[in-house]
Design a protein with these regions (language model features):
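Hydrophobic alpha-helical segments within soluble ligand-binding/sensing domains
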Residues: 39, 82, 138-164, 178, ...
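Short beta-strand elements in bilobed, periplasmic/extracellular small-molecule ligand-binding domains
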Residues: 65-76, 163-166, 187-206
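Hinge/cleft segment of the Venus flytrap/periplasmic-binding protein
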Residues: 26, 35-37, 167, 171-175, ...
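Extracytoplasmic "Venus flytrap"
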Residues: 36-88, 94, 100-104, 167-178, ...
Length: 335
């Protein structure tokens, strides 16, 4: 682990929970022999972030008619609207229901309805707070480990004090809960001080994140770390720093950390404009499709392999192979 930390990249190993989820089970291969597999996808809106844009596109590309699917995707950040969409897909007689939940709670009834109807439920991106027997399998990011990776990086900077601004994502989402937990645990252990605790709201808004930092500056808060739970919010936070003339990045006063691995964010890290970015891979569709078509399911919750990169470890290959969305180009800073 120490060796990996020195180069700034930590592989978050793919893990399987000890609780079996239909171990060795078989998934149906379609509504009828030789027909298209009917799939309902409940997801968040692509406007939420660069991560979500890539995730929505991945789902659309994989679950296409060309690949043997009759799929529809609903995109909303409202949990009640997501639940209503899931209920609609069940009534429509889908074979499989894929869910990335806006909020981790409130899903028991619809999941139990899916089970009674014989609909296979696959979670992606985020876990739901429910009994594992209520879904078939899951392929998700380990948000808690992402948060621990980020906080270990912060603590490893050997700052004389750590006064941190925490900018959370959508409150109650699996991503927010996991990533925030590490910062809150470090605070409770007396390792850091959280001088401002805000959120980008349900849309993980750049503008709302900027307001959190602007308010901290106006209030005279002394801070030296921005812990923003996605790249867009990190961008908004840095806009506030720039407007106030506060230095940041590799040689600046304030360390800036984001999540998701958008290529613009990685180029900012490479340029020393930001300090660190944590990967959260949006590409789950291909693996779930393999599960469905093969009929062979994993024995539990599968966590994706993910990495992080800082100014000491970032390379063009990392940006090319792991980054999301358009690449602004080497040396280009996105403000």
């Amino acid at each position: 682990m120490k060796k990996i930390a020195k180069i700034g990249i930590l592989a978050l190993l793919a893990m399987v929970t000890l609780t079996p989820v239909f171990a060795g089970g078989k998934a149906d291969s379609g509504s009828k022999k030789g027909g298209l597999i009917k799939v309902g996808i409940v997801n968040l809106p692509p406007e939420e972030s660069g991560y979500r844009q890539a995730n929505v596109e991945d789902m659309n590309n994989v679950f296409s008619k060309a690949n043997g699917y009759d799929a529809k995707q609903t995109n909303t950040g409202d949990n009640s609207e997501q639940i209503a969409a899931a209920q609609g897909y069940i009534r429509d007689g889908v074979d499989c229901l894929l869910i990335s939940a806006a909020n981790a709670s409130g899903w028991d009834n619809v999941l139990q309805s899916a089970k009674k109807a014989g609909v296979k439920v696959f979670l992606f991106d985020r876990l739901i707070d429910t009994d594992p027997s209520n879904y078939q399998a899951a392929l998700v990011s380990d948000m808690k480990t992402e948060g621990n990776t980020a906080m270990n990086w912060v603590l490893g900077q050997k700052l004389s004090k750590i006064n941190l601004i925490l900018i959370r994502g959508q409150l109650g989402s699996a991503a927010e809960l996991g990533r925030s937990a590490a910062a809150l645990a470090a605070k409770d252990a007396g390792k850091i001080t959280i001088v401002a605790d805000g959120t980008g709201g349900d849309s993980w808004s750049l503008e709302e994140a900027r307001k959190v930092v602007e308010a901290a500056i106006v209030a005279g808060k002394d801070f030296n770390v921005i812990y923003a739970e996605n790249d867009g919010m990190a961008q908004g936070a840095v806009q506030a720093l720039d407007a106030a003339g506060i230095t940041h990045g590799k040689n600046g006063k304030v360390k800036v950390l984001g999540f998701d691995f958008n290529r613009f964010a990685l180029r900012n890290v490479q340029a020393g404009y930001w300090d660190c970015d944590i990967q959260c891979s949006p590409r789950q569709a291909g693996e779930i499709s393999k599960w469905i078509k093969s009929g062979t399911l994993p024995s539990g919750i599968v966590f994706q392999k993910e990495i992080f990169a800082d100014t000491a470890s970032i390379t063009d290959d990392i940006i090319k192979n792991f980054g999301l969305n358009d690449d602004p180009g080497k040396g280009v800073i996105t403000k």
